[in-house]
Amino acid sequence: MGIVRNQSIKNSISFYIGMAIGAINTVIIYPNAFNDHPEHFGLIQILIAYAILVSTFTTFGIPKTFVRFFPVIKEKGQLYFLSLIIPLLGFILSLLVYFLFKQQIFELLNASPLLKDNFFYIILLVFFIGFYDILTAVSRSFLSAAAPIFINEVFLKVYSMLLLLLHWFGYLDFTTFLKIYLFGYFLKFAVLFLIQWKNDRFSLSFSVNDLKLKEILSFGLFVFVGGASVMLVTRLDMMMIGSMLDLEQVAFYTVAFFIGNAIKVPGKSIAAISSPLVAKALEKQDYKETQTLYTKSSINQLIIAGVLFLCIWLNIDEIFSLLPAKFQGGKWVVFYISIAQLFNMITGINGTIIVNSKYYRYDLYTNAILVLTTVITNYFLILKYGIDGAAMATAISISLFNLIRLILIKVKMNMHPFSLQTIKTILLLFVMFFTLDFLPDSSYAFVDIIWKSIVVFILVIPAIMYFKLSEDINELIIEVRKRFLDND
């Protein structure tokens, strides 16, 4: 777990810097830059959402397949070749589908004129997003996920911030802004490609003769269907809002969703480095190590996500008061998404364990249930409750999905991520919330957000240490204290 902790610290730095920049972008700059035309903000989100979804199909599950088989395949060059040729063929296929069925696609999506005029950008994004995911998988297989995470979480968001400011203050019209903004996805691909090339991680062999193609492609197929299902679910709410409501509502939903979804950041950093370690442990049938990774991921994610939830929900009215009036209607979107992600965090790296185990086929079945639930709940709840309904649907779907996976791992592998520390942490979070909810407000929202958040950390950190809720977090706190307080 030491590798996980050290890598997670590095990754978390990028994630939290990215989260801070993303928060400034999403909560302050985006709403103000697009206050007069929120549909432009909605368009950007829809373009990226569709591109990410389609790129999941074009890569055919290769990123996770690469991580899964990299430790056991001797012919690395052939695996590299296979991992590049399949996404390339997938991209060419998506290009053909677009040109042959463009009008039918527009009708199916109930695309607005603004979306139709800019739809081709999706195809270009598909290429760069897809191959960036492949390069990220290569980095993770070398236990070096820090570079792609930094590029995606920090570099791209700083780039976006600069462009948004230029657009906000009138130096770029929207058409020019959009082109330069989307060019950033080419830049992040190019930077990561050069890093991999410099580290000599591309020893290509233009052959696949020595690979167990049936096993690899079979695994890839199930991972692909599962991954596509998850990606569809994570973007479906936004897509259905765009089709059933309008692009303006997509913009309003995006801001609220971002705030609620922020608590899953620690899970991303832990999962990024845990994946190859789980793959190695399960390859050796080391279930004790797998259980350790499972339990520690759960408690670490719960503690950090829980603290973030306290900071967000105790300040929710102050946060929304900082937004332009048009964007202030998403309070309950934040609540539903936050609760769903809290449950997601407490269930640990369940998806990583299933995908890397002999039960990986169940990933397909659980994702099929997830997609079905998401489509049905979004359709009816969006019609009745608008963007609040979309958040309710997402919360129901994510919670049911993780509950099924939790039960599956317990039944098939006799493992669960919970311990006495889990109960202690949940009780601590409840006590903290009901105690701090009575903190007085000042007349300044920004001041309230800062001082309430500081109080949360001042009270929670000693409690974590006293009750010994997490070995890893305790060690991290001790290291930080020694570095900054004991250097006399």
Regions flagged by a language model, labelled:
Residues T58-K74, S141, A256, G260-S298, ...:
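Helix-loop junctions and terminal segments of transmembrane helices
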